[in-house]
């Protein structure tokens, strides 16, 4: 073992990456109290450009990134990344840990803590900088093929709060309603939908469509998620628009005056009829019940355990 085999997270630069989140100043103060050495990158347009700016702000080759809506657990900064006996790819990989979503209780990478290397971030081309003809990176960093060094990890170290305002909650739902309907960034046909969209995405999409009435602005998130799926799968709307946050403002102006529950119910009937998606908005009490039991058997296994490792164990691959 050499000195580079184990990295203390506390020795890494920590970048708080914010844009237009309504709670970003409050969260920045909390992050600075928790992580006094934290730095901030704010209001950089475009996800790829913002991450590149975060990489440039870091003085350490590997760094920790906190999204603007995310509040980490303080214990995260006491952990170590132990690369002893790990494949060399672990040292090169980017890690996306899970976050608990405050709206619906989901635990996955959306909004979660992440760790990047300056070299990788400087050379990646995602979102607004994706390569011509490559749609896999339109709305996410998830990548396949030989360059797959962006890894979904199993452990959960934070909670994301994308529901501070009606617009923020609606946008969060809409974005996920679009992303989870796609097949590696491409829009499937209606007939292909259930075959090409992974079962895990469908499970999470269904939860976005139905859970969250127990929290402030949760119904706006449900409406947004249903609308995102509807516009992606059943209209001619260009789903590539999802990558630019400015586009949401214009779209929001068309929907801000509407009643979210009434609209979500109407869209739900169409999604059930055309895509055979389960539509059942849970009451606040039912949502609380679901979230309590959904997270009951979730526990951390180690910061370098990948999500795929656990899935293989569970499914006996």
Predicted segments with their positions:
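N-proximal low-complexity "stem/linker" segments adjacent to membrane-targeting elements
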Residues: 1-33, 317
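Hydrophobic beta-strand segments of well-ordered beta-sheets in folded domains
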Residues: 10-16, 36-39, 63, 89-96
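Short acidic, S/G/P-rich loop/turn micro-motifs used as interaction or catalytic elements
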Residues: 19-23, 70-73, 102-104, 120-123
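A short, glycine-/small-residue-rich helix N-cap motif at loop->alpha-helix starts
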Residues: 42-50
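Short alpha-helix within the catalytic core of nucleotide-sugar-dependent glycosyltransferases
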Residues: 51-52, 74-86
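Active-site nucleotide-sugar/metal-binding loop of Leloir-type enzymes
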Residues: 52-62
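Short beta-strand-to-loop acidic/aromatic patch adjacent to the donor-nucleotide binding site
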Residues: 61-74
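Catalytic-site signature of metal-activated, phosphate-bearing donor transferases
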Residues: 81-317
């Amino acid at each position: 073992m050499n000195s580079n085999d184990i990295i203390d997270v506390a020795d890494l630069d920590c970048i708080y990456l914010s844009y237009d989140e309504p709670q970003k100043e409050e969260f920045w103060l909390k992050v600075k109290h928790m992580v006094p050495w934290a730095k901030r990158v704010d209001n950089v347009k475009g996800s790829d450009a913002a991450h590149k700016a975060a990489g440039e702000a870091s003085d350490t080759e590997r760094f920790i990134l906190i999204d603007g809506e995310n509040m980490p657990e303080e214990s995260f900064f006491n952990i170590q990344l132990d690369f002893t006996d790990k494949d060399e790819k672990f040292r090169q990989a980017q890690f996306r840990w899970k976050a608990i979503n405050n709206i619906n209780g989901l635990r996955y990478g959306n909004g979660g803590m992440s760790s990047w290397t300056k070299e990788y971030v400087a050379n990646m081309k995602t979102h607004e900088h994706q390569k011509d003809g490559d749609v896999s990176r339109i709305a996410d960093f998830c990548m396949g093929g030989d360059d797959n060094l962006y890894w979904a990890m199993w452990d959960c170290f934070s909670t994301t709060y994308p529901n501070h305002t009606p617009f923020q909650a609606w946008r969060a739902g809409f974005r996920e309603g679009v992303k989870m309907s796609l097949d590696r960034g491409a829009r499937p046909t209606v007939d292909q939908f259930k075959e090409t969209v992974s079962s895990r995405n469908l499970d999470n999409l269904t939860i976005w469509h139905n859970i969250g009435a127990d929290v402030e602005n949760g119904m706006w998130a449900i409406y947004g998620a249903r609308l995102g799926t509807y516009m992606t799968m059943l209209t001619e709307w260009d789903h590539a628009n999802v990558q630019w946050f400015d586009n949401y403002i214009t779209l929001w102006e068309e929907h801000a005056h509407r009643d979210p529950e009434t609209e979500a119910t109407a869209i739900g009937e169409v999604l059930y009829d055309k895509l055979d998606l389960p539509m059942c908005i849970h009451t606040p009490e039912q949502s609380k019940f679901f979230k309590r039991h959904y997270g009951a058997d979730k526990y951390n296994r180690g910061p370098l355990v990948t999500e795929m490792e656990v899935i293989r164990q569970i499914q006996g691959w």
